[in-house]
From Swiss-Prot:
This is Pimeloyl-[acyl-carrier protein] methyl ester esterase. HAMAP family: Carboxylester (MF_01260). Belongs to the AB hydrolase superfamily. Carboxylesterase BioH family. Gene3D superfamilies: alpha/beta hydrolase. Keywords: Biotin biosynthesis, Cytoplasm, Hydrolase, Serine esterase. Pfam families: Abhydrolase_1. The lineage of its organism: Bacteria, Pseudomonadati, Pseudomonadota, Betaproteobacteria, Rhodocyclales.
Amino acid sequence: MNRPDLVLLHGWGLGPQVWSALTPYLPAGLRVRTPALPGHGGTPARGPTLEAWSDALLPELPDDAVVCGWSLGGLVALDLARRHPHKVARLVLIGTSPCFVTRPENAAAPWPYGLAASTVTGFIDDFAHDPAATLRRFVALQALGDARRRTVSNALNAALANLEQCRPAALGAGLELLADTDWRAALDDVRQPVQLIHGAGDALMPLAAAEWLATRLPDARLARFDDCGHAPFLSHPEDCAVLIEDVVRG
């Protein structure tokens, strides 16, 4: 029986090269695709909705793929699985939360597991004035809480989106997607098996969000890395590759 293709979706402000630490540990012969998100790495920009970003990736996806999304890429992967289930056989979600921003207790649907709205708004405003500095600051947050912080920081900085090849407006739209998206109500529609991978020290998307997600998705399990931040596939690529291979093998 042929193994499915593996599609790796990177996070905001970075490029497909962020997967270069992981791919050497994946099984030989596995077909791996690493498309760029809209507006990243010279790809065309799309509308400011998660659905538009997901649909832009459809030509890159074979049927019945295993889709592995990290951070914003994880939200895109969830949307693909819900709206295009023939494209997504199984999911791997790394450092992914259904809702990036906290919602207050008096909101219709409170959510305590995220960044404060003021922090994210600050990122959006700062990016509009100084994209390069904001990207570097975002990368620094992703490495926090990791025992191999320097290794992670170096890998992330090497994979930073080249602003000369990117569309700043599209990158700004990606930040707004993170700020505005609340995917909790749609989780029951994801019927595919899901492997969650999360760092206990994640400073962007707290572990509690992944723990909540694991209880709400119909078919999910969570692998926790105690000494990791937001990018466990960079600090523990071999361990993450083993988990991904298990998903690919079904």
